[in-house]
Every structure is written in structure tokens, then in C-alpha cells.
Amino acid sequence: MGNALAVYRDTFPPSPTYSVNDVPDLTGKIIIVTGGNTGLGKETIKVLLQHNATVYLAARSPSKAKAAIDELRDMTGKEALFLQLDLSDLKSIKESARQFLEKEKKLDVLLNNAGVMMSPIEQLTKDGYDLQFGTNVLGHFYFTKLLLPLLLSTAKTTGEARVVTLSSGAGLMVDEIDFNTLKDSPARKKLGTTKLYMQSKLGNMVFSLELARRYADQGIISTSINPGTLKSDLARYVDSLIYKLILKIISYPVPMGTLSPLYAATYPDGKSLNGKYLKPWAREGELSKTATDPELGKELWTWMEEQVAPFESNAS
């Protein structure tokens, strides 16, 4: 009940005290934003470009990315850089990281923004995982893992590197990660697409906090984010007219959703944000007992390591 009340309150947050005008000058900073071709990702990139960051727009579709980059150039006069990334394909993720590592010698911020919400139950990743968990959690884990050596070397040089992972208040609404539902199975179909989405958002929280535990002493700052309920295309798979109407009523403009991720990515006292969960609008929130369970953190991390291990050899 407490989690449900917290989610309800966070759906109607107070007016923000933080704004995009508080973002510092980001000259010299290199940032990746996954899912940057649309919605919250694109709006976040716009602000980062306006504050002089070098930004890689990571997305699956070259044509959609190009259209977004052109639009961002028109709005900001700055050029985002395209990085092809399909988070539902582990082999593609490895290639994307390889391409980035060939181009850059540092990475200040990895903003794990991309996500899938309530996709049709029959949809799986290329490797056979539930599309929502496979994309939202496992895909971002593998991308982060591959870039971690560069993040660590950046932190050694500059004092810090940040990983900002988008979650949702929905992650507070479930009390476990059922590992039997992460690949196609009768248990997965029984759980249903809504709870699978909630479970993936819990997974984002658990991953982000476990990353903070493991690498805080090496300068990594890991934060999870509830950006708020936004008027974006994330809910494109929702087929309930009533639910769509409710979302329309309670949703906020997309630019509002940039406040928490921008705060986590650029707030000068970044170390104070390590392991934290930010809710709308750039306020510190409280994670559930499940999300903060260190045993679940270890279990999820170990499971994800096992899933990506076959792709770690040079032959893959």
C-alpha cells in the first residue's frame, strides 16, 4: 500500500524548483543518450546540445535518427552524432559499443533512456528474451558493461563518470523479479504485458543501485530516474481506450520529463546522487525494499552476466 501511495503522489508532483537553465556549461563533455531519436530522449539531447555537450544519439533506425538530428540542428544549431544501437539484439549492442570505442577516448555520461512499454506479449528480443526486460534491462546492462572500462578510465582522469538509467514509478508496484518470465514461457504469458513492464522497471532500479554498489569507489555515479508521466510515444502499444484517456489526463509535456535525468547527468555535486532514485521533478525519492535488496541486486547482476557471456568471445 505504501508503494502505491508513493506512486500516486509522484504522479502529481509539486512545481519544479529546478529548470533547464540550471544545467551548467557542458563544453568538453561526451554523452550518449539511448533512444535519442524521439520523445524524452530527443528533448534531453536538445538541452544537452544547447549547453555545448558532444552528444551521441543512439537509436536503432538510421532514417529516424537522421530526421531527429536534422530537427535538433534546426532547433539548437548544434549537431548530434548518430550511433546505431538495437537494444533488443545483444550482438548489435556489442557492435555499437565497438564503434563508439573506436571514435572516443572518454565517456562522461551514459544516459540509458530507451525503453519499451507494454508491448504485445508475443514480441521477444532477437535472442528470445521478453521484449520489455530484454530491451529495458538486459540490453542496457550489456551496453553499460561494454562501455564500463571507458567510463572507469574517464572517472580516473576527471574524478567521475555517470550512468543515468530511466525507470518508472511502475517499478515500485511489484515485489519481485520472476526469473522464469524473462524468456518466453507459460509463466511469462500468464504474468501479462503490464506486469512484465513493471518488472522491467524494477529491474532498472535494481541494476542501477547494484552498479552504484560495485563501482562507487572507482568514481562511477549511478542514478535511477522516474521522469514522470509524459505525453510521449512510449505508451504506443497501450490498447485500452480507458487507460489511454487516463494517461492523456494525467500526463505532462515531455520537456518536464527531462528535469530529473538532466539533474542526474549534470548536477555539479554528482557524488551525492550515487545510488539514488530521482522522482519528478529532480527530487530524491525512496526505493522499495525489493529494489534495495542487495541479494536481489547480486542475483540479477549474475543472471545478466550469464546471459551476455556467450557474446563476450571474439567470435561472436
Curated annotation (Swiss-Prot):
- InterPro entries referenced in this protein's UniProt entry, alphabetically: NAD(P)-bd_dom_sf, SDR_fam
The UniProt GO MF terms for this protein read: oxidoreductase activity
Q: What superkingdom does the record give?
A: Eukaryota
Q: Which Pfam families match?
A: adh_short
Class of the enzyme per the UniProt entry, highest EC level: oxidoreductase
Q: Does the keyword Nucleotide-binding apply?
A: no
> Which residues span the membrane?
none
Which keywords does the record carry?
NADP, Oxidoreductase
Task: Give the Enzyme Commission number.
Answer: 1.1.1.-
Q: Where does NADP(+) bind?
A: 40, 64, 86, 113, 145, 197, 201
Q: Which residues form the active site?
A: 167 (proton donor), 197 (proton acceptor), 201 (lowers pka of active site tyr)
What's the stated role of this polypeptide? Short-chain dehydrogenase/reductase; part of the gene cluster that mediates the biosynthesis of erinacines, cyathane-xylosides that show unique biological activities, including leishmanicidal activity, stimulating activity for nerve growth-factor synthesis, and agonistic activity toward the kappa opioid receptor. The role of eriB within the pathway has still to be determined.
Give the similarity note. Answer: Belongs to the short-chain dehydrogenases/reductases (SDR) family.
Protein name as catalogued: Short-chain dehydrogenase/reductase eriB
